[in-house]
Swiss-Prot record:
Effect upon mutating T119I: In FSGS6; results in altered clathrin-coated vesicle dynamics when expressed in a heterolgous system; severely decreased localization to cell-cell junctions and clathrin-coated vesicles
A single GO molecular function term of this UniProt record: actin filament binding
Location within or outside the cell: Cytoplasm; Cytoplasm, Cytoskeleton; Cytoplasmic vesicle; Cytoplasmic vesicle, Clathrin-coated vesicle
InterPro entries assigned: Ie/If_SH3, Kinesin_motor_dom_sf, Myosin_head_motor_dom-like, Myosin_TH1, MYSc_Myo1, P-loop_NTPase, SH3-like_dom_sf, SH3_domain
Family: Belongs to the TRAFAC class myosin-kinesin ATPase superfamily. Myosin family.
SMART domains tied to this protein: MYSc (SM00242), SH3 (SM00326)
Tissue distribution of the protein: Expressed in the immune system. In the kidney, predominantly expressed in the glomerulus, including podocytes.
Gene symbol of the encoding locus: MYO1E
Phosphoserine PTM positions: S980, S1002
Protein name: Unconventional myosin-Ie
Region (Actin-binding): 581-591
Length: 1108
């Protein structure tokens, strides 16, 4: 049922172009190539979503798509999946309704490799559920927390990698908890394996967590002073990888979003200040370097100790002591004693980095706990879980973190394989349908290789064993691990070793892991000395982040990072198994992160390892389409009189009647207990074709008539209102009197740098690039914007100083409030010049769309002043100048514009001293009105007159040519200047005096920024043993030996090549880009030819093209 209680068939909402198939179950040929080709067709037409049954495939567009607004939310709310094109909102709505109706917990598993768009998909699901669910003030508060948790956790947990500019470096399972009525009244976040090592080291070309760069870019002057914030390259930790800026990330703006998120979640201002204090403290901690003195470590420059000690509220000397030495407990003969051990340079650097990593991890845990406390509820009822976890990834050097990340992805792949197959199997059994199981690669063998406890032990068990037996030994542990792996699992088909590590044949391809640091990172133990140091802080907040009981914690073996992630992964699997699962399979189309860039081999590789072909086969399993009887009857009821408008009888018999009415063979369908199953896509297309024949004719007649009526009424009214302003007062131009009004001739949606000058909620009535003449009558380009309140003139200037020096940026040249306009002056001739008279000074402008502009200005003027806009018509116009205090043109003064009868439709301008002479030929008579021509477009040949097919206007001049002989400046967008930043942070909570910020040390050899030696790891990975397994379980495609029929030869038609880009000025025209090839259908002496481009037929100016 629709939202208003009236059933709407899904064809009613398909007012969109179709590209490929929406559901790949309906592909006539199931091969990896056909799947890739279908995804490519849809991707190139900006359809990023495709179904495989109930599974949603999402291809990352690397740009903002237009179909995520209020209109789409309303369209998908309460609608069945097949009623609208594939969309993530359909899946989110299905989850939400199933939870309410079935009273079952739901979850969505979002999987895909790094950079495939998983985090964005999770955001859309949470925002949709937040939007469609009801509730009062408390519920709205929970919704706000749910939405604001994303920017906060992204700031502290996301980073730029070589594969993804906003890569999640932690896993997150977000449970949105609901009341029985469906209102979100609570929530819970479980986070997994934050990649804290990113704080102190990362691959070349990557960044640390976003918050460090946000703080440096967005902090106020007061914050920068108190936190010791300076340039990014001052901090050793940030300079490691040589990457500071990201093209599509505005760190300054996102810093404000992070602060706002902390406010919404309820983190006190004092705690916010301390969180930022720790972030800055980590940066300053990294600047402490060490030198070797007698084989031991000493701080190279002690002045670098002062600021981190100050920010963390600890004693400077104690910090120095704990970084260069360690207390070790020793037992001998039943007695224990503490030994003071001095560290070497390598150990001191490790200790410093361990403290920095621990501080960031503890702050991250504090933020997660704060979010959970803000959403906590007494008891759980129903929930929807959203799993957004790090994607499968391969880097130049893959360490322990990548090993854990890829293990979790193996577990998720296993869930997908088992649950989709299990759910499909159960449906056939319940409906009494026979089916043949589909073979597939089960990656359980890889999961067991990693996590098995015994017989044989898995990699994680061997790793924990080595860490336990060599707990006090740092050197040689990694090589011992490698030797044990070779000895115990070296013969495993999904495992290989090499001199510095090992290789796992994952489901997504072979990954080579470097053993360096494996054991140390798995131990993940923070030295007691560092905990004692942080517990000595005079800041209670920092103390609270280290709550360990040091005496109690000395007993027992500490839990390793590997065992933690293994337990978290298995707990996650158990949680997901208790929910009704939904799936989003994200695909990354390229490594360039650019829209419309399609790497065929990369996509095909993902299609293969995600098992999409097997998924389609399982879904079809002999029957490509299935639908419950009621829905099937509703959809195809129009096919027979007996079923329309409703079937009177048993639903199953009604379905059988419909199938027999289209003469479908009995072996092409089967009726289950509650559903009809149709075998081949062609049989379904037969039903669709029959239905279309019934509806199509009626729909076209209604649509055509209605559009014709509305368009004619709208355009006639607009043209006549505009024409009345000039009627009997000014000659009209032949090429504009009958044109349609567009309003936006700049494309404001694509130019946010212009929107910054307009109020947030101001509607832009008119936008055009016009010519503005100065006191010397020299023409310059200005963007003219008209809103209900103001008129704006925007120009461009080079920045002369500051960080943006030399860049050309938009500048607001003039802003006139509508009510301050005194009058508008025009000539009586057909020119496009007019003068805006304002109290201070006038503006002399020229616009080919002057009539449209003046009609809109007149409306807004009347709304504001309750008076009509004064329009003055004369062939001698007075121009009042702006007062200046420089040069020979000082003072205000005036100028005069005189109009004379000339020749042709193009105005000729001749400035002379203080007078501008304008000559132009005669136009249409002053009493001319727009003709009431048909607004519907005729795209074929017509036997009528030329005027029926061609506009009454001259073909436009090619780009670069101005009608007055002046070269036009091309419109070039530039990034807007960054706005000012606010700060509401309080002062630091420490009794220490702020130390001076030490000068940056000269870069030593171990601090040189790295550059990637090779980008081979970005190539499609070797599929390994998993790929071989997939090939052996694949069945041959049907009719594999038959050659394809030869395509029909295309008809030969004359063609032309576009010399310049052209934007259609009317609804019957073609838009095209330079170098486009256009089929010529008809040439006309008027200069307007008829052509066809990309399936669309229309008029275009012949002076913009050349024949080929």
């Amino acid at each position: 049922m629709g939202s208003k209680g009236v059933y709407q068939y899904h064809w009613q909402s398909h007012n969109v172009k179709h590209s490929g198939v929406d559901d790949m179950v309906l592909l006539s040929k199931i091969t990896e190539n056909s799947i890739v080709e279908n995804l490519k067709k849809r991707y190139m037409d900006d359809y990023i979503f495709t179904y495989i049954g109930s599974v949603l495939i999402s291809v990352n567009p690397f740009k903002q798509m237009p179909y995520f607004g209020e209109k789409e939310i309303e369209m998908y709310q309460g609608a069945a999946q097949y009623e609208n094109p594939p969309h993530i909102y359909a899946l989110a709505d299905n989850m939400y309704r199933n939870m309410i109706i079935d009273r079952e917990n739901q979850c969505v598993i979002i999987s895909g490799e790094s950079g495939a768009g998983k985090t964005v998909a999770a955001k859309y699901i949470m925002s949709y559920i937040s939007r469609v669910s009801g509730g009062g003030t408390k519920v709205q508060h929970v919704k706000d927390i749910i939405l604001q948790s994303n920017p906060l956790l992204e700031a502290f947990g996301n980073a730029k990698t070589v594969r993804n500019n906003n890569s999640s470096r932690f896993g997150k399972y977000f449970e949105i908890q609901f009341s029985p009525g469906g209102e979100p009244d609570g929530g819970k976040i479980s986070n997994f394996l934050l990649e804290k090592s990113r704080v102190v080291m990362r691959n070349p070309g990557e960044r640390s967590f976003h918050i460090f760069y946000q703080l440096i870019e967005g902090a106020s002057a007061e914050q920068k002073h108190s936190l010791g914030i300076t340039s990014m390259d001052y901090y050793y930790y940030l300079s490691l990888s040589g990457s500071y800026k990201v093209d599509d990330i505005d760190d300054r703006r996102e810093f404000q979003e992070t602060l706002h998120a902390m406010n919404v979640i309820g983190i006190f201002a004092e705690e916010q200040t301390l969180v930022l204090q720790i972030v800055a403290g980590i940066l300053h901690l990294g600047n402490i370097s060490f030198k070797e003195v007698g084989n031991y470590a000493a701080v190279e420059s002690e002045e670098f100790l002062a600021f981190p000690a100050y920010l963390l509220g600890i004693n400077q000397d104690r910090l120095k002591e704990k970084l260069t030495s360690r207390q070790m407990d020793s037992k001998w003969g039943g007695k224990s004693e503490s030994i003071h051990v001095t560290l070497n340079v390598e150990q001191a650097c490790y200790t410093r980095d361990a403290l920095a990593k621990a501080l960031h991890a503890r702050v991250f845990d504090f933020l997660v706990d704060s979010i959970n406390k803000a959403m906590e509820k007494d008891h759980e009822e129903y929930n929807i879980g959203v799993l957004d976890i790090y994607g499968f990834e391969i880097f130049q050097k893959n360490g322990f973190e990548q090993f854990c990340i890829n293990f979790v992805n193996e577990k998720l792949q296993q869930i997908f394989i088992e649950l989709t197959l299990k759910a499909e199997q159960e449906e056939y059994v319940q409906e009494g349908i026979r089916w043949t199981p589909i073979e597939y690669f089960n990656n359980k063998i890889v999961c067991d290789l990693i996590e098995n406890k015994v017989n044989p032990p898995g990699i994680m068990s061997i790793l924990d064993d080595v860490c336990a037996t060599m707990h006090a030994v740092g050197e040689g542990a990694d090589q011992t691990l490698l030797q044990k792996l070779q000895m115990q699992i070296g013969s495993h088909e999904h495992f290989n070793s090499w001199n510095q590590g090992f290789i796992i044949h994952h489901y997504a391809g072979k990954v080579s892991y470097d053993m360096d640091g494996f054991c140390e990172r798995n131990r993940d133990v923070l030295f007691m000395d560092l905990i004692e140091l942080m517990q000595s802080s005079e800041l209670p907040f920092i103390k609270s982040l280290f709550p360990e009981n040091l005496q109690a914690d000395k007993k027992g073996r500490p839990t390793t990072a590997g065992s933690k992630i293994k337990k978290q992964a298995n707990d996650l699997v158990s949680t997901l198994m208790k929910c009704t699962p939904h799936y989003i399979r994200c695909i990354k189309p390229n490594e360039t992160k650019k829209p419309r860039d399609w790497e065929e081999s990369r996509v095909k590789h993902q299609v293969e390892y995600l098992g999409l072909k097997e998924n389609i086969r399982v879904r079809r399993a002999g029957y490509a389409y299935r639908r419950i009887f009621q829905k099937f009857l509703q959809r195809y009821a129009i096919l027979t009189k007996a079923t329309w408008p409703s079937w009177q009888g048993e639903e199953k018999q009604g379905v059988l009647h419909l199938l027999q009415s289209v003469n479908m063979d009995s072996d092409q369908f089967q009726l289950g207990r509650s559903k009809v199953f149709i075998k081949a896509p062609e049989s379904l297309f037969l039903l669709e074709e029959m239905r279309e024949r019934k509806y199509d004719g009626y729909a076209r007649v209604i649509q055509k008539s209605w559009r014709k009526f509305v368009a004619r009424k709208k355009y006639v009214q607009m043209r006549e209102e505009a024409s009345d302003l000039l009627l009997n007062k000014k000659e009209r131009r032949r090429n504009s009197i009958n044109r349609n009004f567009i309003g936006d001739y700049i494309g404001m949606e694509e130019h946010p740098e212009l929107q910054q000058f307009v109020g947030k909620r101001e509607k832009i009535d008119f936008a055009d690039t016009v010519t503005k003449y100065d006191r010397r009558f020299k023409g310059v380009k200005r963007d003219l914007l008209l809103t209900p309140k103001c008129l704006y003139l925007i120009g461009r200037e080079k920045v002369k100083q500051g960080p943006d020096k030399g860049l050309v940026k938009e500048v607001l040249k003039r802003k006139i409030e509508i009510e301050r306009i005194l009058s508008v002056s025009l000539s009586t001739m057909q020119d496009d010049i007019f003068i805006l008279h304002e109290q201070e000074y006038d503006s002399l402008l020229e616009s080919v769309f002057k009539t449209e502009f003046l009609s809109l200005l007149a409306k807004r003027y009347e709304e504001k002043t309750q008076k009509q806009l004064p329009l003055k018509f004369s062939n001698t116009l007075e121009l009042k100048l702006k007062k200046e205090n420089w040069g020979p043109w000082s003072a205000g003064g005036s100028r005069q514009v005189q109009f004379h009868q000339g020749f042709g439709d193009l105005a000729v301008l001749k400035p002379s001293n203080k007078v501008l002479q304008v000559s132009i030929g005669p136009g249409l008579p002053k009493n001319s009105r727009p003709t009431r021509r048909n607004t519907t477009q005729n795209t074929g040949y017509s036997s009528g007159t030329q005027n029926a097919n061609y506009p009454v206007r001259a073909a436009p001049p090619p780009p670069g040519y101005h009608q007055n002989g002046v070269i036009r400046n091309q419109y070039v967008p530039y990034p807007h200047a960054p706005g000012s930043q606010r700060s509401n942070q309080k002062s630091l909570y420490t009794s220490m005096a702020r130390p001076p910020l030490p000068r940056q040390q000269s870069t030593s050899s171990d601090r040189v920024s790295q550059t990637p030696e090779s980008l081979d790891f970005l190539k499609v990975p070797d599929q390994g043993a998993a790929g071989v397994r997939r090939q052996t379980t694949s069945r041959p495609p049907p009719a594999g030996g038959r050659p394809k029929p030869q395509p029909k030869p295309k008809p030969q038609v004359p063609q032309c090549k576009a010399l310049y880009a052209y934007d259609a000025q009317d609804t019957d025209e073609l838009s095209f880009n330079a170098n486009d090839i256009i089929d010529i259908i008809k040439e006309d002496p008027s200069g307007w030819w008829t052509g066809r481009l990309r399936g669309k037929q229309g008029l275009f100016p012949n002076n913009y093209v050349t024949k080929i």
